[in-house]
Amino acid sequence: MRKMLAAVSRVLSGVAQKPASRVLVASRHFANDATFEIKKCDLHRLEEGPPVTTVLTREDGLKYYRMMQTVRRMELKADQLYKQKIIRGFCHLCDGQEACCVGLEAGINPTDHLITAYRAHGFTFTRGLSVREILAELTGRRGGCAKGKGGSMHMYAKNFYGGNGIVGAQVPLGAGIALACKYNGKDEVCLTLYGDGAANQGQIFEAYNMAALWKLPCIFICENNRYGMGTSVERAAASTDYYKRGDFIPGLRVDGMDILCVREATKFAAAYCRSGKGPILMELQTYRYHGHSMSDPGVSYRTREEIQEVRSKSDPIMLLKDRMVNSNLASVEELKEIDVEVRKEIEDAAQFATADPEPPLEELGYHIYCNDPPFEVRGANQWIKFKSIS
């Protein structure tokens, strides 16, 4: 009898030590998956497009929610650090566009490739880098993903080729990466992203032509957030049907605020490229909450009411949250716990990013050359000992 009472006491004391919300979540039975209807994509030169229904598992839903919430909180922390003058220089935030970076990653393989423009923080995270490495790069510290030398626009990870500062210049590079995939006989694709502001660049159309001519496994992706700096798409383009811009290249127009739409469209586009049919073009209709960059308040060319309307009706995190709660894939309490954990992760990363030392002056020339080639090959001044170390 005493042993039984002791065992019961241990069980009850263990429950008492846990927060009530955790006990409630642990005892609740959730659905393993749910089927959702998603918006049909507009098609160009395609007879069939991505499915209009999709299955979301509880595991994937929780993962997507955590990732989008992490990107959102990371960008808000970057905004705070910039206003405190801890982050300097160019800084472009992507809050509001989380469904794009998380949804694209959900539709490809880790071995696939991705290159984008300067609004790159979210993609850097979804490609596998930690919040610590990203925030430390923003603050110019040694622990940053580019050793503190790249900043906001020049971050890199495995199979992620940046952050590129020149408008539209990454698109021919993306076609080149796709060429390498085909040349090496690899079943890989390259996601090549650019914004609506870059969509009128001539080099993009040249890349279209070469990719179609050589049937490269390249997914050209226009992130249409409706404004190129402060210019609306209607004032910048004679045709705002960016998914048709490839002309001879098939295209999709996708709801870029819905992570499930983005995921299914990406899977469809990747399968198209892997089949050897050549490139395909995706237009993601999305929206950024911040201005173009930190120097742009974002309300001189659009109203606060417009921004608030998008937040209230189309926010990608809220859309996923509502779906999961209403389909018994998760509870409000469980998602709140994730929010708390994400905030703590961001705060810890921010402390690291402000306490980590800056790179010393003697390391200014490090990481320029690969495999430490001799001076006569690199053509450098003999008295400047540039080094290449990893």
Curated annotation (Swiss-Prot):
The modification N6-succinyllysine is found at K63, K244, K277, K313, K385. GO terms for molecular function: metal ion binding; pyruvate dehydrogenase (acetyl-transferring) activity; pyruvate dehydrogenase (NAD+) activity. CDD domains: TPP_E1_PDC_ADC_BCADC. Pyruvate binds at H92, Y118, R119, A157, G165, V167, D196, G197, A198, N225, Y227. Thiamine diphosphate binds at Y118, R119, G165, V167, D196, G197, A198, N225, H292. Residues 1-29 form a transit peptide. It comes from the Eukaryota. Keywords: Acetylation, Carbohydrate metabolism, Glucose metabolism, Magnesium, Metal-binding, Mitochondrion, Oxidoreductase, Phosphoprotein, Pyruvate, Thiamine pyrophosphate, Transit peptide, Tricarboxylic acid cycle. Its main location: mitochondrion. Pyruvate dehydrogenase activity is inhibited by phosphorylation of PDHA1; it is reactivated by dephosphorylation. It catalyses: N(6)-[(R)-lipoyl]-L-lysyl-[protein] + pyruvate + H(+) = N(6)-[(R)-S(8)-acetyldihydrolipoyl]-L-lysyl-[protein] + CO2. Its EC number is 1.2.4.1. It is found in: Mitochondrion matrix. Phosphorylation at Ser-232, Ser-293 and Ser-300 by PDK family kinases inactivates the enzyme; for this phosphorylation at a single site is sufficient. Phosphorylation at Ser-293 interferes with access to active site, and thereby inactivates the enzyme. Dephosphorylation at all three sites, i.e. at Ser-232, Ser-293 and Ser-300, is required for reactivation. Acetylation alters the phosphorylation pattern. Deacetylated by SIRT3. It is an enzyme of class 1 (oxidoreductase). Heterotetramer of two PDHA1 and two PDHB subunits. The heterotetramer interacts with DLAT, and is part of the multimeric pyruvate dehydrogenase complex that contains multiple copies of pyruvate dehydrogenase (E1), dihydrolipoamide acetyltransferase (DLAT, E2) and lipoamide dehydrogenase (DLD, E3). These subunits are bound to an inner core composed of about 48 DLAT and 12 PDHX molecules. This is Pyruvate dehydrogenase E1 component subunit alpha, somatic form, mitochondrial. The gene is PDHA1.
